[in-house]
Every structure is written in structure tokens, then in C-alpha cells.
Amino acid sequence: MQQTKKLTQCDVTIAVMSGSFLQRGEPALVSKWYRTKMALAGGIDLVVELPYAFATQKAETFANGAISILNALGVSDICFGSEDGHVQHFYNTLSLQQKKQNTFNQLVQQYISEGNSYAKATSEAFSHILSGHDTIDMSQPNNILGLHYIQAILSQKSTIRAHTIKRFAAHYHDESFTNKHIASATSIRKQLFIGDCSFTSIYPFVPNCTSSLLEEYYHIYHVLHNWETYFPLFKYKLLTMSAKELQHIYEMEEGLEHRILAKIQNATSFLTFMEAIKTKRYTWTRLQRVCTHILTNTTKEEIKSAAIENHAPYIRLLGMSQKGQSYLSKNKKQMSLPLLTHTKTFEHPVLNIERRANAVYLSALQEPLRTKCIQQNITQYPIRYNEIDKTFL
């Protein structure tokens, strides 16, 4: 955050945040409202939601949704973390890919025919055509997402300027604490699910406000969300579905439904299930996203009828500082998308999917908190934060 503000010299900082489920194809650790509080306390002025229909997608669609929202908000600059750290390398990569598009496409098909996943095939194709140039390493996850952010800016003819900050010490997929002061989100989540959910082990790696809000959420709702939380519901759902029904689930490829139905029979946890269905053809993240769509019953037809293309249909405001509120007051009339402060009266196929995904996410809570929170997700107004007094209003 400090580096972003220094790099962009921004007046207002805006975060586009996934809701209940994440791009990796897994539930968020705590609710979007608690994560909004963490963001506001950490220095963000406006927190807006990236809808499920974009948030649980491949990098290209995820980036298109995020950039369309930022563009509608009138953002001048974006900043993302990457393993590379040089924004010009991203533009070089896109330029070379376009010049060698035919070769690139042929290589992708060749690597897929050899049994590689699409992600692995594209990574290998990039490696081949980019060798010897000042370009990015397309085997790194944050580089991949960053490339799609810039691609989205260009394809949407946006005037947004891109910046990137090099990620140091902790890597995206690190599962253990390898540095005394910096840890990956993956390692922090894993640590929280070891033993009796001890929060003290993560204190050196997260801001005080974040650890306090994590503890508060756990003490109120008695859960931190991960896939194992939902495994009983997930297994029940699969045991009551046919292969034909599974074929309609979004991102389900032909033949995968039979493997899923066969392996769920003896699976005793989500981890053992994933290990059983994992093959060279599909990445772990891709399979988790399919599982997320099964859990939320998101179908191919639904996503198609939502007609999301490259643009989000609305902006859901989750939280704002006083500075953020002032920015909205001045710029609201110029925004090219509807700004929602609640979802009581707004209707859209993307929002229908969102409501169902939220309800499924909150099924992990006990009654009466579950029903109360499901209703609050619809009626909740944005969280307001006084950045001077550091208090929520």
C-alpha cells in the first residue's frame, strides 16, 4: 500500500475485491464485510466488489471485470504486484505475442496435444516465443494476472496507467513462513488451520487491525472458511447429481464429470478428493474453480445469459473512508456504471448468481446467524470509516 501511494502519487486509493469466493476457486477466509474493514483500516479509501461471475474465472475474465469497474470509477492509475517488477516488460510481452500470434497458437495446441493443461501449454508457448527478449516469466501467477490487467486496459481503450511492484521474499504459492517479516497469503491461511486456529503465529506478518478482525470474526461466527468447511455439503451435492446434470456446470469439460463422480465416492476430505481427480490436463486452481461452480450450482447457461463479455454490469460499493465518500460525491454523476450501495431493488443475472454464491458461503454459519447474514448481504449499506479517528461509523 505504501509503495503504491508513493509510486502513483494518488489522492484516493480504490480496491476491487472478490466477494465470497476467490479466483483460486476457494472460499474467502472471512466474509467480504470483514475484509472490507481490513482494507479500510489498512489505508484503502473505496472498496468495491468484483462479482462472482468475474472473480471465479480465468485471469483474462477476472482482469476484464476489474478494469471495467475501475474505468467506470474514473481511476487514473492501477498498481499490481508481480514477480517481474518492470511494467515495460509486460507491454513488451504483449507486443511480441501479437507479432507472433500464429506461432503462439500453434505451440499452445501442440503442448495441449502432448497432455499439458491449457495453463501449462500457454506458459510453454510464451517461454518459446519470448526467449531472449526483455519480457516477463509467464510461469509466474502474478505476472500472468498483471499481463491480463494491461491487456484489458488496451482492449477497453482505457486511459488508465499501469504500474507494478516487485514481490519480494514470499511467493504466491509458498505454504510456509520462509521470511521473518513477509509471508504469502497461502502460508498465512495454512497456518490458521493448523491445530486450534492459533492467531499468534501470524502476528508478525499481518497488520494489527487485520489480526484483530480475524479473531473477532472467529469468536462471533466460530469459523474460518476453507474448502473443508464445505466438504460435507459439496459431497452431498455430488452424490445427488447425475453426470448429465454435471455437464451443465460452468467450466465442466467433457469427461471430467465422470471422473468427479467416481472419485467422490471414497473421498473423506476435500484434499483427498482433489488429489484423486488431479491430472496433468487440469491445474489445481482450474479444478477448484469447477468445484466452486458445483457448490454454487453455477451453470454454463447462466454465465452465457448474464452476457458479461468484458464488462461488469454494476459497481457494488462495500466500504468507504471519508476521503472516499468525498470522491464519490464529486464523481458519481460521471460514472458509466450503476453504483449500488445495497442490492435490495437492483436486478441483473450477474447479481442473481452473486446472491446465491453469498448464501452458499454463509451456509457454514450456525442459525440464527446464517439467515441474519444472508439478509444483511442484500440490505447492508457500505461500511464507513473515519481515517482520522481510525473508527468505523
Swiss-Prot record:
One of its GO terms (molecular function) is tRNA binding. SUPFAM superfamilies: Nucleotidylyl transferase. Transmembrane segments: none annotated. One of its GO terms (biological process) is tRNA modification. Keywords: ATP-binding, Cytoplasm, Ligase, Nucleotide-binding, RNA-binding, tRNA processing, tRNA-binding. The gene is tmcAL. Its EC number is 6.3.4.-. It is an enzyme of class 6 (ligase). It comes from Bacillus cytotoxicus (strain DSM 22905 / CIP 110041 / 391-98 / NVH 391-98). ATP binds at residues 81, 142, 167. Belongs to the TmcAL family. HAMAP family: TmcAL. Catalyzes the formation of N(4)-acetylcytidine (ac(4)C) at the wobble position of elongator tRNA(Met), using acetate and ATP as substrates. First activates an acetate ion to form acetyladenylate (Ac-AMP) and then transfers the acetyl group to tRNA to form ac(4)C34. NCBIfam families: PRK13670.1 (NF010191). This is tRNA(Met) cytidine acetate ligase. Disulfide bonds: none annotated. One of its GO terms (cellular component) is cytoplasm. It catalyses: cytidine(34) in elongator tRNA(Met) + acetate + ATP = N(4)-acetylcytidine(34) in elongator tRNA(Met) + AMP + diphosphate. Coiled coil: none annotated. It is found in: Cytoplasm.
